Amino acid sequence: MALSRFPAPRSLSSVLQAGLFVAAVLATSTASARPVSCTGPGAPTTTETKCLTAIAIPGNPIRSFDISWVNPERAEYYLADRSNAGVDIIDTRHNTFKKTIGGFVGITLNAAGTAVDNNHSGPDGVTSHGKWLYAGDGNSTLKVIDLEKGKIVATVSTGGTTRLDEMALTPDGKLLLAVNNAEDPPYATLFAANGDEEDNSVASLAKIFVSTTYIPGGFGQSIEQPTWNETINRFVVSVPTIANNPSDPAGCNYGQLSGAVTCSGAVLVIDPTNLVTPVEKVVPLVHCGPNGATDGPNGNVMVGCTPNNQAGDNETTVLNVTTFNYVDVGDLSGSDEVWFNEGSNRYYTGSSAMHGGAVLGVVNGTTNFLVEAIPQSSASHSVAADSRRNKVFVPQVAPKSVVGVGGDVTTVGAGICGGMSGCIAVYSVPGVGDE
């Protein structure tokens, strides 16, 4: 019988090279199988605003969210994530998920169980100063979060039965204005907030109603987003619809009649130092039913007109709060949250109800001209930017096939996210920042 010959011994280097080759093949195979974010219509390459990455949120696929906020000093982005009943915190420096602070109502469905009941879901509005984060919830409460402790440290009722929604702080963080937009009549609550204090002492100071001349009870009118304007040292608050605007003989429908609402909205000017008559002015808008509001340069405030409030709204309004002169940004409407980023001198709009489909709108802060509109998932109504790092954060819902009614009815979100669970899209923008 012939003897078998053993294979010749191989050198150690050849063995290592073979192992490295196999590892490289496996790594390449794994990478090719991993979903790729920032693809499709939501990631154009010719725009100044470019899709940088997408951040996945652990837990439930994203079906419903509300307002978002950035604290550039802490390098943190906050999202009112109803799908996971908490506020998501993102590291804006490294574009990574940090944690979700729970303890909120989460998603409440309508009576038929077929869609999200926004008026009773939470969290809703969010804002922050220093280590303090404030968030409205679906049960008419303000949640006070200590970010150093990573938990809710106080819950303050505003006395309603529906959500506490949008809110804004003074620059020193000592006064907070928050609105119950779904009460009838709607109202705002002024709080003493924590400023830079170590311990919580949040307390309600006053409940603020608008004259029934403008918001008669019983017709479903609302109050929306406050913003602080440093030019006049007042809160400026968007109101989707007021009665008799325009005040022509034919009249308009603010909800007292059947059919579409035809009255336009307004902005309120609120003086937080006057607790007796805090509503200083009601400024009617021209063919604009706004949701969002953000403080821009030169005493200007952008308000996000939307056809969800007034049929036919095809523009976004920039209003000067000293003269009350205004300009309209054409070919951009349907926004909920709007945000001014001083690092890039751009306004950004979460235009989920834009005619033709949801977009991230980009507007020059000096000229007030539309720069570009970038497609988004069909419910992308929230936007916030980090002025130090010049990044824009836009939440994307998961597809309707995954989460049901309220989900993305396009493929745009899945292309941005690189998956089917929703995400937070991160866009890089040109500008001057500290980092």
Please report, for each region that a protein language model flagged, where it lies by residue.
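N-terminal secretory signal peptides that target proteins for export/translocation
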Residues: M1-S14
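N-terminal leader/targeting segments
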Residues: A2, A18-G19, S157
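Hydrophobic helical h-region of N-terminal Sec-dependent signal peptides
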Residues: L12, L16-L26
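N-terminal signal peptide c-region/cleavage motif recognized by signal peptidases
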Residues: T28-T30
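Predominantly soluble domains enriched in secretory-pathway, periplasmic, or organellar proteins
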Residues: A33-E435
